[in-house]
Amino acid sequence: MKTRFLNEMASLLVVLLLFSCTGKFEEYNTDSTGFTDEQKTYDYNTFGVWLKVVQMGIYFNYDWGNGKNWHFQTMQNLNADMFSGYMHDFKPFNAGLGNTVYNLQDGWNGTMWDNTYGYIMTEIKQTEDHSRDKYPAFYAIAKILKVEVMHRISDYYGPIVYTKFGESDAGVMPDSQKDAYYAFFRDLGEAIHLLSEYDGEETFSRFDMIMPENYRTFGEWMRFANSLRLRLAVRIAMADPDKARDEAHKSLTHPAGLLEEAYEVVAVSTAGTGYSNPLGEINKAWGEVFMNANMESILKGYKDPRLSCYFEPATGQGYSGEYRGIRQGTGFNHSRYSEHSRSTITQKTDAILMTPAEVWFLRAEAALRGWSGEDAGTCYEQGVRSSFNQWRVGEANTYLRSDLVAADFVDTFTPEYSAKALCLVSPAWDEEASRETKLEKIITQKWIACYPEGCEAWAEQRRTGYPRLFPVLVNKSNGKIDTRTMIRRLNFPVSI
């Protein structure tokens, strides 16, 4: 059955990819940009148009003719954002029988796959094919963006079509996750090598939507690529430790360096780019993004000053001004939770992809594993300080001395939904603690710092089991998903 499934998937993928690369090319590259074919022949307009579409397609909010925002809701917000323990929604989608209770909806699960392959990988393929020889820098940046886009897809599903995307051979098969990750490392290595031949500001910086404003340089792209390589190396630390150590060493020793300064936040900009944050639309306009119970438990327990940056106080009678979350799988009388804490994200909030804080925590884990000469505790504390700087919540010294742990979760309306705290590590670094306790501290703080990027948080929680999350209250998977182990991957869409 497995062989038959893969054969059918591969055959249908070829049809999808061929159609995507040809039939709608004009729609993707003209209608949404305002550039005419004649204008595209000048300067970097052709590549710039493709590049902008790809950047909009990472934290997906690209309008291919069927509206915006709702794609992101099913691609990420009702999946990774919820499974990561970050967010929840009080509305009973599909009569309450949706992903929140592990009754996985094919129409939701497939949008990440379908939209990425149908609209984003096509642009990457065009950029690679046309820039490889003529514009190596464009080619290199396309490679970096390709990895940033596609590692998220592999983290969702496992095997993906990557190395042979767009080929017409009917025998094309998906890459295993291991092969895909090895290809990610090759692409990042090639991109870094190509960009090392350049210096100064990008010649196409006006199309750059994700590097920090005033720092849109080739060097910044190399630091992002290096940091991305370190992220992926740490991701496979348990599955393929030798390869992980090798790739981490390349990142940690490369002269271009890593993202580490406060300004080096990689995010899709909403400032005059035509991009709006889809999570902000779902949150502010639709009223469908609320604090998850795990965020309440951990941030309130730690007395974490970032809590007010991430969520608004509740407005319900009797608990107005407090921070209240919703536990995943909460019973379907959801309207009672409509006055709980909502996200602070707006349509104008830049969509964060990677921060210096995350990179410091990656360095902390690398040091903990003996991959570098750095001190794990020093890197850990620098990660916390970097996140405090990013959110402008003051100095972190008091927090880093704190022995506070997560608080018990008390449901506002239903006592049986309440739960004892599961995360029992404190912010204070303890050099005498066990290696596993140190890892739990690193990942828990990285989870806090990565907010609101649910894809990365969910991937790391599945890899390590940290932070320890409350299990789903109601499990409607018919035994397919273990309540304690929790969901590990999304199903492939039936369409493939």
Regions found by a protein language model. Give the residues of each.
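Structured, solvent-exposed acidic/aromatic patches
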Residues: 41-45, 88-145, 149-396, 432-440, ...
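Extracellular glycan-recognition regions
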Residues: 24-26, 110-112, 466-467
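Bacterial Sec-dependent N-terminal signal peptides
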Residues: 1-32
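Beta-strand acidic-aromatic groove motif in beta-rich domains, primarily in extracellular
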Residues: 63-75, 159-160, 245, 454, ...
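Terminal processing/anchoring signals of secreted or surface-associated proteins
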Residues: 1, 21-24, 54, 147, ...
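C-terminal functional modules
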Residues: 392-395, 400-496
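Membrane-proximal, proline-rich intrinsically disordered regions
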Residues: 21-80, 84, 126, 480-496
